[in-house]
């Protein structure tokens, strides 16, 4: 059986983990090499990109920005900053109009400092914060820099104390923290009511398909696989000739000029231009490009070592 090479965008339902989705897709496709991009909390629904086969090696090179639609509940503080946590306190929210809500949202737009929730996957002294929180420990989690490019108020319900919103943000942003911090600014506390991710790693909700049946995933017809180039449309491309392809397959540098590159078919908008999720990658800040073989398929990833040299970063079907 041919191992699939590409992506499936799952519309993750509530109540299961991102890893549960990966496990089910392994059974559907009958392969072990499956990964996902951008963990979603169990209660959160929406876009979950699934990488199949060697496409898992492409995940660090996809755009990291994400978009969400959701609701913030005023008047409630919880242990996890969403409604799945234990209720810490409850109080009435003030009378507010739409203009006042907009004014409260303004400080959260742009480049800001944000402290992750106590119940989160952030490492604190070598251990996940959520593991320590479940033991009843309280810890100081350092704030970190994130970017909220767009925070749109959709509706304010005074009677229910609910703020409906759209947000477009950088990788590493916690929407639960946004809800918590907004509540503290208003003075009544708040937590996340519900959340749906509408865009992640360059994929959007219109591309998402339902998660295959839990009871008989092996009998389910596998969903269509999006080709790798679909996910890499934000990067320029370098087409190899036969001689270059032989060198490339052996992991050797390619001599080329930047004017030989094809421009990115769908370059990122200004509010999406951030570094790839893998910030520890030494090539993360270099000019990445997709390398295309003689058949027009993805041969790997590379970056410009200098103005005339392309250095391999990921090589598919390597020889030697």
UniProtKB/Swiss-Prot annotation:
Active site per database record: 41
GO BP terms: mRNA pseudouridine synthesis; tRNA pseudouridine synthesis
Region annotation Disordered: where it falls in the sequence: 116-136, 259-284
Catalytic activity: uridine(55) in tRNA = pseudouridine(55) in tRNA
Superkingdom of origin: Bacteria
CDD domains: PseudoU_synth_EcTruB
Root EC class: isomerase
Biased composition (Polar residues): 270-284
EC number: 5.4.99.25
Example of a GO MF term: tRNA pseudouridine(55) synthase activity
Signal sequence interval, chain numbering: none
Keywords assigned: Isomerase, tRNA processing
UniProt cross-references to InterPro entries, sorted A to Z: PsdUridine_synth_cat_dom_sf (IPR020103), PsdUridine_synth_N (IPR002501), tRNA_psdUridine_synth_TruB (IPR014780)
Ranges of biased composition (kind: Basic and acidic residues): 125-136
Protein purpose: Responsible for synthesis of pseudouridine from uracil-55 in the psi GC loop of transfer RNAs.
PANTHER family referenced in this protein's UniProt entry, alphabetically: PSEUDOURIDYLATE SYNTHASE TRUB1, TRNA-PSEUDOURIDINE SYNTHASE
Assigned protein family: Belongs to the pseudouridine synthase TruB family. Type 1 subfamily.
This protein's name: tRNA pseudouridine synthase B
Organism the protein comes from: Prochlorococcus marinus (strain MIT 9313)
